[in-house]
Regions:
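Short, surface-exposed secondary-structure edge patches
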Residues: 41, 60, 76-78
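Short beta-strand His + acidic residue motifs that chelate non-heme Fe in jelly-roll/DSBH
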Residues: 50-52, 70-71, 88, 94-100
Length: 125
């Protein structure tokens, strides 16, 4: 068994192109011995966002705090709020933006592909 408290896991800024004001706490990954899924806590400051992107891994997300907009198409945006659960299919484009006044916090899981740790995703071709 592995037990961690989220505050004991360092927040790591995501400095990839198209990301702003976002950090991740990699709670449980392949580095911890997870065989199939990684569990991550994503935090986005007010006005922050991730890029409009897709990857081969599915995403299961649960929104803990904040008000945000999910963009899944060039012209389609959906309001998301704390308590919402979301499934994004493999290679489904998406972007999360924090449109609220407080920190956005969401739990995000991704499957572990061979050779992956859960800290990164696999771009769609």
């Amino acid at each position: 068994m592995i037990l961690k408290h989220s505050e004991d896991v360092p927040a790591e800024p995501i400095n990839k192109p198209g990301f702003s004001g976002m950090q991740a706490r990699f709670l449980l990954t392949a580095d911890d011995g997870c065989p199939r899924y990684a569990l991550r806590l994503m935090e986005i400051v007010p006005g922050g966002y991730c890029s409009f992107h897709c990857h081969k891994e599915e995403h299961e997300m649960f929104f803990l705090e904040g008000e945000e907009v999910l963009k899944t198409d060039v012209s389609k945006e959906t309001q998301i709020r704390a308590g919402d659960a979301l499934l994004l299919q493999p290679c489904e484009f998406h972007q999360i933006r924090n449109t609220g006044k407080g920190m956005l916090k969401m739990i995000c899981t991704v499957p572990l592909f061979v050779g992956k740790t859960g800290r990164e995703t696999t771009p769609c071709e």
